[in-house]
Every structure is written in C-alpha cells, then in structure tokens.
C-alpha cells in the first residue's frame, strides 16, 4: 500500500501499474468505494475516458462484466469520454472483485475477449496520475487506508530551512 501511495504522489505510471496489477480486485473495489463515498469529484475522473479504447473493440458507451455490443469491461475503454461514468460504479458493474482485474474484457466480433494485458491496471494508473496534486494526495491516503496490509504513513517534505535550523541547534 505504501508503494501505491508513493507511486501516485510521485507520478510514476509504470511502477504504479505494476503495483496495481499485483493488488487484488477486491482491494481495488474497496479503494473505489472509498473514492466514491468521500470524493465524488475524483470518482468521475477515473475509468470514464477513451485512452484505452481500440478500434477493434467497437464503439462501447457503457460497461458490463461480460461485454456485449457497445459494452466493455475495460477501464477508460469507452468510445468517448463520459464524466457521468463513475469509478465506483465501474468496479461494481464489471465485477472487479472476482474478474476483469488486472485485465479487462472487450467485445470483438460477437464475443467477449481479453483486452490489453493488465489493461485495467494501466488505465487506472494513468487516470490517477492525471489527477491534480491535491487529488493525488487524497488518493494516496485512500490507497494507504483501503488496500489490504496498508498502514497510514506520513510523507513530509523537508525544506532546507528546517535542515539549517536543526544543524545550528545541534551545534549549540
């Protein structure tokens, strides 16, 4: 959980993707629910985009656990961005607790197929990294609190002034 929080705050998409891919779908669901309950403005910024949409996936406008025509289980795999789609609803709709994590399914030529390997983890990571600084701090805290085995940690910034004050104090 510390690794996830650190990767969000520092904007390390690849490391965040790898860490998210190792996290259980159940834990991601708990995180998404916490986001939805406490920060609805962030809830509508994750998994509702089109950056993971591929031409062969058709024109999905909504999510479904086992995709059919115009449906997908790929985070940010919509044909067009839709801010009415919420992260907290995405995880429920695609049944992330026991399927579609870290790889989602897409609908191609009359059947649901596995999407991009670790595609859902990659999309969630990108969407989290794209948040503003304050939102990333909030997300880091929620990740630390909701991911199994997580513990709350405080990451402080150290300024040169405090280092100088401490150094001078130590000399006295």
Language-model features: locations:
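Long non-transmembrane domains of secretory-pathway and surface proteins
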Residues: 1-172
């Amino acid at each position: 959980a510390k690794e996830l929080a650190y990767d969000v705050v520092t904007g390390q998409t690849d490391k965040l993707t790898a860490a998210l891919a190792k996290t259980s779908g159940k834990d991601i669901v708990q995180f998404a629910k916490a986001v939805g309950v406490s920060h609805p403005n962030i809830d509508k910024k994750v998994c509702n985009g089109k950056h993971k949409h591929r031409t062969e996936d058709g024109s999905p406008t909504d999510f479904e656990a086992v995709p059919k025509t115009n449906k997908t289980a790929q985070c940010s795999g919509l044909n067009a961005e839709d801010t009415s789609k919420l992260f907290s609803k995405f995880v429920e709709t695609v049944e992330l607790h026991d399927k579609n994590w870290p790889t989602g399914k897409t609908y191609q030529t009359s059947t649901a197929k596995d999407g991009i390997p670790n595609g859902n983890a990659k999309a969630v990571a990108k969407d989290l990294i794209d948040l503003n600084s304050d939102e990333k701090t909030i997300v880091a805290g929620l990740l630390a609190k909701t991911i199994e085995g997580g513990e709350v940690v405080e990451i402080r910034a150290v300024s040169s002034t405090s280092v100088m004050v401490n150094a001078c104090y130590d000399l006295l």
